[in-house]
Amino acid sequence: SGNENLALVTRGRRASEFVDPNNPGELIAWQGSWRALERPWSWAPAWSNYVEAWVQINFPRLFFNTLMIAVIGLIGTLLSCIMVAYGFSRFRFPGRNLLFTIVIATIFLPAAVTIVPTFAFFQMIGWVGTWLPLTVPHYFANAYNVFLLRQYFMTIPMEIDEAAAIDGASPLRILTSIIVPMSTPVIIAVMLFHLVFAWNDFFSPLIYLSTEPNLQPIAVGLSRFNGIYGSNPPLIQASALMASLLPIFLFLISQRVFMQGVVVTGVEK
C-alpha cells in the first residue's frame, strides 16, 4: 500500500467525499475526522540559556584572559614579523635566499615534534603556569606571517625607498613612514590571522595552564564547560555562539581589507 492523492469534493466533520480515480463520475465516501499536523520544528529561543552559560562558565574572566593573550601576542607578531619581512624584502646580504628558505621550511615542521622539548624548556625556566609560553614566542616571528608580509612588501617599488633615502630617511624611518602605511591590507590580514589563532588555540593553553583555571582562555574553558554540561546541548550551543561572536565580528568589519591583503600577496612585482 502507498499514499494516493484524491480530489476532495465535500469535506465534513465526520464524513467526506472524494472523486473516484478509477471512475471520475463516481464519488468515494470516507468516514473519519480531520486534524492538522503539528509542525516538526518551532522557533522558540530560550534566552535564559545565554544568561546561565555566561554565569556558569565565568565568561567575563575567560574573555579577559583570551583577549590579553591575543593582544600581547599580536604586538609581538607585528613587531617581529614586519621587521623580518622588511629585511628579506629590502636588503641584500649573503645567503639571504637560503635563510629565507630555511625560515619558510619551518612551516612544514609539525607542532607535535617540538611540543615535548618546548614544554621541558619552559618548565625548566619556570614559565609553566603563566601566560609567558603563550605570548613570548610570538616576539620571534612566525614564518607564515613573514611570508605574507615579505610578498606584499616586494610589490612596493624600490624607487620609493631610494627617493626617501635621498631625502635623508633612515631604513627604520622608511619602514615606519612608507612601508607600513602602504601595507595596511596585509597587516590587517596578519592581525586577523593571529587573533583567530589565539582565540581558537586549545592545545598550548591546555598543557601550560592546566593547573591555573583563572588564567585559562576561552577555548579551554569551553572544553571544561562541555565536560560538565555535556548532557545539556542548549547551554553548550549558547556558550559556543557567544565565544565565536568576536572573531566573526572582526572578520565582517575587516573583510574587504582582509581579502585585498591576502590576494595582493600572491602578486609579485
Q: Language-model segments: which ranges?
A:
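A structural signal for multi-pass alpha-helical bundles of membrane permease subunits
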Residues: 1, 5-269
